[in-house]
A protein has these predicted regions:
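Secreted/periplasmic carbohydrate-active enzymes, especially glycoside hydrolases
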Residues: 1-345, 355, 360-363, 393, ...
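Oxidoreductase and adenylate-handling cofactor-binding alpha/beta cores
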Residues: 599-600
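Substrate-binding/catalytic cleft of secreted carbohydrate-active enzymes
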Residues: 204, 330-333, 340-586, 590-594, ...
Length: 684
């Protein structure tokens, strides 16, 4: 009886969602199918087995894996009802999934509609011929089990499973702009030549025409941010692919954080005077290049690219994120002052790209062809299933995200191991396929740059992409010298290809601390004091700031995240190299180091504020600030004033704590405004 009641709830919710949305007068209707779902393990195959009610997005691993090195990679069945109203007759119906992790088999009224392999790109299936008026059954069989024909086959992150991104029902006329062409918008704004004087573009539209008729035409309109029409074109439709060249005079360029200016491009399909369909895309016009000696240039001006690698992973949610999660991450990205982000190691959800467009954050985004880093095996297999899936996911990524101006770099792979006669075994040679993937990117989109992230000798991969980037990690104590020597050598041996930093960093637990005075000491394995992460980043950044030839610098990583293979720091199953904690509630010391260097807003921050209990009276006080100087007080006693150094750091050495509480206070001024920070350390 309980199961029957739940099924009735599914029907009622489905009727409410579909009916209310379909009342809209727009030619295309999109209905969010977030509520009314239930799921169960496929192994629970009893006819009336109860479903666990859920709301999308959802993953079955959101809570289970916390603090462990185990999580479930299995198959689940998601179900809900779809109510088809009389008004939907003679319409076309599509199911649009933004992401199902990783394999999805879709059934409507128990008939197979289609399958999709790949957990991080959208897919769209037409269900017009599978439904009838009234109640319809929708089932999605979802598996995150390991398969060699689904990328990734390895990686230092969890494959969560589930319908972990939103799902929609799209309703159109018989003739429409295609939603099934690689689940893309069906509208692609190609930037043929962009300058400050004019923007020459070609708008390519892919149509789906069930009834080819005379009088079909496509109207394309480009409007600026104020809604003013700046270009338009009308073309008679003679087939399912339409190309329309347009020119904008004196365009306002999308210029990163300085001016993330967006235009809207609307494509309308008409039959005579009757509007059949409309798709609107926001985009921005810009041009860019990377120089092996001078770094990256946006619209002809040098732009220092720095930021983080980011995974889609939030405590208690896994990869099933909501809008507030993207908003929170962007708030932190803006606070620290990043100019770019690397979206690791797979295509991310649409809200992240949209937010980066709007906030001027440049993006590297990539397909999930990734190796295991320092763990066993590699990330590439020379077999038909693997390679076909890589090509498919690449096409989906490019077509789905084509119009985002924030995307400047297409990523090919991350840490693919290769036989080097020394450390690595004789794996399948990935180089021929890497070159093929690079060529496919260039065929689909010659306007952007391609890049790879390697942890093995770059000479194996030179010529496989436009840009070289390294994932490189050095020790706590000498990261500046090691980074300087390594990247100078990488530059000198890159055959004049631009070299960048795709990953660097160190782990940190906010619950583990050690005095920086003992940084030469050997730390216990897995012990990740917050202070040492910050010191390590200081050295890296001091080296990188002196090397403008590096086309980008990406920290690993934005936030702590789940990785089932990890046993380090204070929690098993966590990669703790983040600048913020897994729940985004605590910004680590390293976050404030970069804020002091990247964000021009005046700030002052005392490090080791969570190192509250000391057993050694001798210590130091480390401060990050972009103020010219600051004054230190301990228990209101003035210790002294110092000026910041070139990486916006002040260190007071030889500080002696008194038994009991020691209130640490620093003060500094910017103009007439005084900035203060305090914390309390107790000597026991």
């Amino acid at each position: 009886m309980k199961h029957n009641l739940f099924a009735l709830c599914l029907v009622a919710i489905g009727m409410l969602c579909n009916t209310s949305a379909f009342g809209d007068n727009h030619p295309r209707t999109s209905v969010l199918l977030d509520k009314g779902w239930g799921y169960k393990p496929l192994t629970d195959n009893k006819k009336n087995a109860p479903l666990i009610p859920v709301t999308l997005p959802h993953t079955w691993n959101a809570d289970y894996v916390e603090g462990t090195t185990h999580y479930n990679r299995e198959m689940m069945v998601y179900k809900r009802q779809l109510e088809m109203t009389p008004e939907m007759k003679d319409k076309r119906l599509f199911l649009y999934f933004e992401g199902v992790n990783s394999a999805a088999d879709v059934f409507v009224n128990y008939q197979t509609v289609g399958q999709h392999l790949g957990g991080y790109t959208a897919f769209c299936l037409e269900i017009t011929d599978f439904v009838h008026e009234g109640d319809n059954s929708l089932e999605v069989w979802v598996s995150n089990a390991y398969r060699t024909d689904i990328l990734p086959i390895s990686g230092d992150f969890n494959i969560y499973g589930g319908i972990h991104r939103p799902c929609h029902l799209i309703i159109t006329e018989k003739n429409c702009i295609s939603p099934v062409f690689y689940a893309s918008p069906g509208v692609f704004v190609r930037q043929d030549k962009i300058t400050e004087k004019q923007a020459d573009i070609t708008v390519e539209s892919v149509l789906s025409l069930k009834e080819m008729k005379e009088g079909l035409k496509l109207k394309t309109t480009v409007m600026d941010a104020d809604g003013k029409v700046v270009a338009r074109e009308e073309t008679a439709v003679s087939g399912e692919s339409v190309k329309q060249p347009l020119r904008l005079l004196n365009p306002t360029l999308w210029n990163g954080k300085k001016n993330p200016y967006l235009y809207s491009v609307s494509v309308e399909l008409y039959e005579g005077d009757r509007l059949l369909d409309k798709v609107t895309q926001q985009t921005g016009f810009r041009y860019f290049h990377a120089d092996p000696d001078k770094g990256f240039f946006l619209n002809g001006e040098y732009l220092n690219l720095y930021g983080f690698c980011r995974h889609e992973d939030v405590k208690g949610k896994g990869s099933a994120l909501h809008q507030e999660d993207y908003d929170k991450d962007m708030e932190l990205i803006k606070e620290v002052g990043a100019t770019a982000m690397r979206l690791a190691h797979y295509p991310h959800a649409e809200p992240m790209y949209k937010s980066c467009d709007e906030n001027g954050i440049l993006l590297w985004t990539e397909i999930p062809m990734c190796g295991p880093g320092g763990y066993a095996y590699t990330g590439y297999l020379h077999n038909k299933g693997f390679e076909e899936n890589a090509r498919q996911v690449l096409k989906e990524l490019v077509y789905q995200k084509f119009n985002h101006p924030s995307i400047c770099f297409w990523g090919i792979f991350n840490e693919l191991l290769i036989s080097d006669g020394k450390r690595f075994q004789a794996y399948d040679n990935p180089v021929p396929f890497v070159k093929e993937i690079n060529a496919l990117y260039k065929e689909l989109d010659p306007s952007r740059l391609t890049a790879f992230a390697t942890c093995v000798d770059q000479t194996h991969y030179l010529g496989c992409a436009d840009l070289v980037a390294w994932n490189k990690y050095f020790g706590w104590t000498n990261s500046k010298q090691q980074a300087a020597e390594f990247f100078d050598h990488a530059r000198s041996t890159s055959n004049n290809q631009p070299v960048g930093v795709s990953e660097y960093g160190a782990g940190a637990s906010i619950h583990q601390h050690a005095s920086p005075l003992n940084k030469e000491a050997q730390l216990p394995k897995g012990f990740h004091p917050e202070e040492y992460q910050a010191i390590c980043h200081e050295g890296y950044w001091e080296a990188f700031a002196e090397r403008p030839y590096l086309w980008a610098k990406f920290i690993w990583q934005f936030s702590d995240m789940q990785s089932s293979i990890r046993k380090e720091g204070d929690t098993d199953g966590i990669n703790d190299k983040g600048a913020v904690t897994y729940d985004r509630k605590v910004k680590k010391d390293a976050f404030y180091f970069y804020k002091a260097n990247w964000n021009p807003e005046p700030m002052l921050y005392i490090c080791s504020r969570r190192f509250t209990e000391h057993t050694d009276a001798q210590t130091l006080v480390r401060v990050y600030t972009n103020l010219n100087e600051a004054t230190l007080y301990i228990n209101d006693k003035k210790i002294g004033k110092q000026k910041k150094d070139k990486v916006n750091r002040i260190v007071w050495d030889n500080i002696t704590l008194l038994p009991g509480e020691n209130v640490i206070r620093v003060e500094g001024k910017s103009g007439k405004k005084t900035f203060t920070d305090t914390c309390t350390w107790t000597l026991k």
